[in-house]
């Protein structure tokens, strides 16, 4: 599955080539996707090439060929924006302010004292991956796990947070927000396209995303590359 930014770039290249017969320049792609630098475009093109959607033609400048399009592509359609929570959509790098929690209901077929929150897809506890871009289903959680604010759930993929007691297949409960204190476990959006679950630290002016597994290195980013999308407030684990 493509991330939103990958799909935006693929469709932009495709539509531009239909209109003019030549691919857009890197500057045009950067501006179209509202990215801060061309390095982000290079990463997106490499990802699209690895997934078999485009290929670079050798010995020719700006030579790209679109091999295939997403199955759900509609000619002339633009990728949808404005999903909530912003971890799923990125909000073009402008995280959404937390909103008052909507009224929640106790599920008719579940235990008393429970509320339902949306499960918004998967989050990486490992190398960053894209979260699924829609509400996959709802989850019943104890109301005393939530507190104030807007909440959502994500299913964990990976093992980088095992020493914090977070395992592959767990479901994490996230309070939506765009700030964090050092030591908080957060959902972080990296380069406006990929989400990861890590412990938040500051290293001078930079942001460190710290794993809880010695097999993974702490990753350091400039402050403009990381957007906080919420803090961990609870965890649900199923035993089979």
Swiss-Prot record:
InterPro entries: LexA, LexA-like, LexA/Signal_pep-like_sf, LexA_DNA-bd_dom, LexA_repressor, Peptidase_S24_LexA, Peptidase_S24_S26A/B/C, WH-like_DNA-bd_sf. The active site is at 160 (for autocatalytic cleavage activity), 198 (for autocatalytic cleavage activity). The keyword ATP-binding does not apply. It catalyses: Hydrolysis of Ala-|-Gly bond in repressor LexA. Its EC number is 3.4.21.88. Residues 26-46 bind DNA. Keywords: Autocatalytic cleavage, DNA damage, DNA repair, DNA replication, DNA-binding, Hydrolase, Repressor, SOS response, Transcription, Transcription regulation. GO terms for molecular function: DNA binding; serine-type endopeptidase activity. CDD domains: S24_LexA-like. The record marks 125-126 as: Cleavage. GO terms for biological process: DNA repair; DNA replication; negative regulation of DNA-templated transcription; proteolysis; SOS response. It is an enzyme of class 3 (hydrolase). HAMAP family: LexA. Belongs to the peptidase S24 family. Homodimer. Represses a number of genes involved in the response to DNA damage (SOS response), including recA and lexA. In the presence of single-stranded DNA, RecA interacts with LexA causing an autocatalytic cleavage which disrupts the DNA-binding part of LexA, leading to derepression of the SOS regulon and eventually DNA repair. This is LexA repressor. It comes from Agrobacterium fabrum (strain C58 / ATCC 33970) (Agrobacterium tumefaciens (strain C58)). The gene is lexA.
